[in-house]
Amino acid sequence: MSICSDNWIIEKCLKEKMIEPFVDKQVRFENGEKIISYGVSSYGYDIRVSNQFQIFTNVYGSIVDPKQFDTKSLVKIEDDVCVIPPNSFALAITLEYFRIPENVLTICVGKSTYARCGIIVNVTPFEPGWEGYAVLEISNTTPLPAKIYAGEGIAQVLFFEGKEKCLYTYAARNGKYHRQMTLTLPLL
């Protein structure tokens, strides 16, 4: 596997709609104001977070159980800014919809702007053949409240192209998060 360049990303997005909406450059300003960048970079794509968030709460005394997830553990927020409480965690969804080619695997890493503020973004790999909006897991590791800006960059996706197609794509395995259109909570 080798990492894919901006040329490859642009070509796949223009010809195969791998990312929609797609921005073929780095955007660092909007309406004359600095923002957290998004769009194509040298060897990746900086994704944006939508305005749909769910923050974990302990109001109902729930236990987080991935096998029997209790939606009372979360508070829904739809806003241009999400404030994550100290040492807390939020889920969000990307603005971009992805269609991953059958010989490609992605890895997503956080942006340094947020990382230097103690905000860690975790996203599991986008597997070959997967498509959908990506769910983002965002941790505020600081003892202070932390802001997340909707519509701005949140993480970078790196694309790795295999020498051959895999035997079973995510779609062929009927992956449980295939074609997710909303902020999907844990499924078994």
UniProtKB/Swiss-Prot annotation:
A GO biological-process term: dUMP biosynthetic process
Binding sites annotated in the UniProt record for dCTP: K111, S112, T113, Y114, A115, R116, V135, L136, E137, Q156, Y170, Q180
Keywords, A to Z?
Answer: Hydrolase, Nucleotide metabolism, Nucleotide-binding
- What is its EC class? hydrolase
Catalytic center residues? E137
UniProt-listed Enzyme Commission number(s)? 3.5.4.13
InterPro entries xrefs:
dCTP_deaminase, dUTPase-like_sf, dUTPase_trimeric
Cite the GO molecular-function annotations of the record.
dCTP deaminase activity; nucleotide binding
User: What pathway or pathways are given for this protein in its record?
Assistant: Pyrimidine metabolism; dUMP biosynthesis; dUMP from dCTP (dUTP route): step 1/2
Q: Which reaction does it catalyse?
A: dCTP + H2O + H(+) = dUTP + NH4(+)
User: Looking at the keywords, is Hydrolase present?
Assistant: yes
The family note in this entry says: Belongs to the dCTP deaminase family.
Subunit structure comment from the entry: Homotrimer.
Q: What does this protein do?
A: Catalyzes the deamination of dCTP to dUTP.
Protein name, as recorded: dCTP deaminase
Gene coding for it: dcd
